[in-house]
Amino acid sequence: MSLVSGLTEVTDADFETEVRGSELPVLVQFTADWCGPCRQLAPVLKDIAFEEGDRLKVVQIDVDRNPGTTVAYGVLSTPTLMVFRDGEPVRSMVGARPKRRLMEELADVL
C-alpha cells in the first residue's frame, strides 16, 4: 500500500528497476509513517506527480522498511528528496518545502 495515495511506493527490491532504470528523471521521497513533515509534503508531491507526470516520475520509499536503499544513499533525515537522472542521483534536498520552491529547485533537472 502506498504511504501517500497516488504515489508509487518503491522498495529495496525494485529500486534498481523503478528508479535507476527509469527513462524519465525520478523524484524519490525518502519517508516514514511517523514523519510529520513528510505528511505536509504529500499534497505537494501528489500535485507534481499529476502535473509533471510526462516529464518526471515521483515515487516514495519508506526508510524503516527499506534500510538497504536508505543507507546506500546516506539518507539521515526525513523527508529527503533525491532526484535521479540516467540512473544516478543528481540532486538531494532535505525537509518539506512549498510547491513553488520545489519546482524552482527541480527546474534544471526537468
Please report, for each region that a protein language model flagged, where it lies by residue.
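Proteins that catalyze or organize thiol-disulfide redox chemistry
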Residues: 1-57, 65-68, 72-80, 85-110
